[in-house]
Amino acid sequence: MLVKADMTKDIAQVMAEVGRKAKAAAAPLSIATSEQKNKALNAAADAILEARADILEANRLDLANAEKNGMAASFVDRLTLNEARIDAIAEDIRAIATLPDPVGEVIAEWDRPNGLHIERVRTPLGVIGVIYESRPNVTADAGALCLKAGNAVILRGGSDSAHSSAAIHKALVKGLEAANLPADAIQIVPVTDRAAVGEMLKGLGGAIDVIVPRGGKSLVARVQSEARVPVFAHLEGICHLYIDKSADLDMARRIALDAKMRRTGICGAAETLLVDRAVASTHLAPILGDLAAGGCEIRGSAEVLALYPAAKPATEEDWSTEYLDAIISVALVDGISGAIDHINRYSSHHTEAIVAEDAQTVARFFNEIDSAILLHNASTQFADGGEFGMGAEIGIATGKMHARGPVGVEQLTSFKYRVRGSGQVRG
């Protein structure tokens, strides 16, 4: 249940209690069997489908508020739930249940000359705090992934999706209860006041082990600057698609249209198109024509405008903008070297793709660009944990510590060492 900011209890006290409950739930959850966790996940998926009408009604309240507040179309798209999206949420939870349990997996082992046998074993992180914007599906994905990895989780979604997230959370709790797991293993922050985020970033008195922010630049920047606990940063997706002179034009057209227009409001949508200057006269117009016919606004450099006058002039700001909308910035570059220079200058290190047939060109793209996900002859919209076979993702980490790329169940674990001896002493 969500509480307004003028509640009788102080927000710090409320959040401290949330942290205490999460910490208490984390201990039994860390040793829960795979069967228990999978039972909880499948029961949660059932509960979501059974509560379909309630979830849709809650979502209608959120959508009405978003319309009243004049939110952008891309924002409303991410907020919107329908029959198909609810089915997809349930399917994603079931897919997570089918994944191998990472907890207890021996990821390396070796013997020492003195007879000690050493094992590196996956363990839960503990309590994860997830702070995200108004995407109701993240409530389900994050809750399910953390559960599978044996972690308790505290979910703080955007206030604009409060009703939808609360309805989904209710179904997740039913899943926990069906498997006799602690209901506090998946909690939703019970207040909409932003001060609750500040309390989470302080760590709730040592209760939170890691924070995962999922949202725009301002949210992630705040988390990174204020957090007193480790952070898995999910930065904006300024994703690039480069069309090399060796590319198959038909393939390039299909990929460009999908990378930008399949869903414009997701972090894996292409925001900048780079075309090899050597094939601009033959490749640029067909590709941009497809995008324009699909309703995409083209913003191009002066060279692009000369070849495709229907484009609008691009500004310097465009090259570092995540549109999350039917807009794309377009530039011509001097082959793979020019593409690498442009991407390394403007990228958020999320996802980049190349369409090319030349193996050496592809090798340079893979070796010289330092982004979390690099694709060859495939759409940037495959930058997704589900598409990677992870079941779902809690976000796409763009940093370099611990987790990078799609954050699935394995990335939500740590490890410990088990050392077996037969009486050895160092002496």
UniProtKB/Swiss-Prot annotation:
GO terms for molecular function: glutamate-5-semialdehyde dehydrogenase activity; NADP binding. Its main location: cytoplasm. It comes from the Bacteria. This is Gamma-glutamyl phosphate reductase. GO terms for biological process: L-proline biosynthetic process. Pathway: Amino-acid biosynthesis; L-proline biosynthesis; L-glutamate 5-semialdehyde from L-glutamate: step 2/2. Catalyzes the NADPH-dependent reduction of L-glutamate 5-phosphate into L-glutamate 5-semialdehyde and phosphate. The product spontaneously undergoes cyclization to form 1-pyrroline-5-carboxylate. PANTHER family: DELTA-1-PYRROLINE-5-CARBOXYLATE SYNTHASE (PTHR11063:SF8), GLUTAMATE SEMIALDEHYDE DEHYDROGENASE (PTHR11063). It is an enzyme of class 1 (oxidoreductase). It comes from Brucella canis (strain ATCC 23365 / NCTC 10854 / RM-666). Keywords: Amino-acid biosynthesis, Cytoplasm, NADP, Oxidoreductase, Proline biosynthesis. It is found in: Cytoplasm. GO terms for cellular component: cytoplasm. Belongs to the gamma-glutamyl phosphate reductase family. NCBIfam families: PRK00197.1 (NF001221), proA (TIGR00407). Its EC number is 1.2.1.41. It catalyses: L-glutamate 5-semialdehyde + phosphate + NADP(+) = L-glutamyl 5-phosphate + NADPH + H(+).
